[in-house]
């Protein structure tokens, strides 16, 4: 009789595959919500530069780029951080808060006529994208390494 031993290995969860899927969903949702906001009368035009409105696909592009940066952070934390999940969540929440600051501080300073509805909508779109991407990526990360 021969005995066999089975090695138990924990398969790493795929951060990239799920992260890219969440990125695509977040880009589509934020673009759709930006379109709805435009149709509802929210202006994405800077009164100081009315000839340069924020293009609708700009929402998709920026959501995609910055969500992919989040996917990259998750992949790095999965390999390097002692507590990947909590490190990722804390880092991304700080980055989310920092991304909202210009909507309420810098933009109105440069253009005092910038509508509050625009600032709130832009901030809301940041939160929506984060609410889609962060939980998906966090669920793919181990609690501890």
What residue spans do the PLM features occupy?
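Hydrophobic transmembrane helix segments
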Residues: 28-55
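Hydrophobic alpha-helical transmembrane segments
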Residues: 16-24, 60-64, 88-93, 119-124
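A loop-to-helix transmembrane entry motif
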Residues: 51-66
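Short, Lys/Arg-rich, polar N-terminal cytosolic tail immediately upstream
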Residues: 1-15
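Internal alpha-helical transmembrane segments of multi-pass membrane proteins
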Residues: 75, 79-97
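Transmembrane alpha-helical segments of multi-pass membrane transport proteins and ion-pumping complexes
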Residues: 26-38, 67-75, 100, 104, ...
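Membrane-helix boundary connector in multi-pass membrane proteins
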Residues: 102-120
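Membrane-water interface at the C-terminal end of transmembrane alpha helices
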Residues: 18-27, 31, 127-145
């Amino acid at each position: 009789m021969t005995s066999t031993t089975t090695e138990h290995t924990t398969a790493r969860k795929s951060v990239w595959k799920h992260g890219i899927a969440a990125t695509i969903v977040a880009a589509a949702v934020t673009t759709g919500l930006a379109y709805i906001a435009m149709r509802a009368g929210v202006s994405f035009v800077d009164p100081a530069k009315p000839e340069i409105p924020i293009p609708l696909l700009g929402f998709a592009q920026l959501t995609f780029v910055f969500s992919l940066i989040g996917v990259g952070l998750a992949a790095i934390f999965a390999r390097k951080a002692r507590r990947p999940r909590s490190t990722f969540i804390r880092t991304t929440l700080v980055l989310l808060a920092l991304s909202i600051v210009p909507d309420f501080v810098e933009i109105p300073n440069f253009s005092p006529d910038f509508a509050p509805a625009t600032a709130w909508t832009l901030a809301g779109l940041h939160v929506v994208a984060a609410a889609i991407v962060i939980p998906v990526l966090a669920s793919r990360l181990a609690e501890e390494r």
